[in-house]
Amino acid sequence: MRIRIVCLVLGLLASVTPPAFAREHSIGNPVVVDGLILHPVYLQPVHMAPVLPGMDGAKFDAHLEIDVHADKNNPQGFDPGAWIPYLTVSYEIKKMGGDWSTFGTLLAMTAADGPHYGANIRFDGPGKYRIRFRIMPPPYQAFFRHTDKETGVSPWWRPFEESWEFTYLGVGHKGGY
């Protein structure tokens, strides 16, 4: 009887254990801008669907993500912690001390740990990098807001940029993945 109870308890514990996620590496501390919490991270390249030309995960060094969630003071009607949809998020990465740079637009996507904006990217090897994100509000993607007195919310924020500096150690190194 005791063995059955122990097995049952272990089975229940295993069923409530959170799923294992790929190890994310923070690019910098989260910041709050215009009622939004921004937190950029990277992890190993991932496979995504639908697969568009140039999206083969094997050809990249990392998967770049930025989580964009509502702050407790979000004036556009999003609940605290809610993911903000319909953004246009572009990025530019420069290797410090050199000429190398890359840029692109992140795609809205979801994963086991929730929705985010992301893309598989290449780095120019290990080194110190600066990344700049440009965040454009939802009306650029045709997401509207109420403006009447009874149900309206504050106007969308103006497009803005945020930057971080970070060290990329490369694949398979401590601080890499």
PLM region descriptions:
Residues 111-118:
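Aromatic sugar-binding surface patches on proteins
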Residues 17-22:
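Sec/Tat signal peptide C-region and signal peptidase I cleavage site
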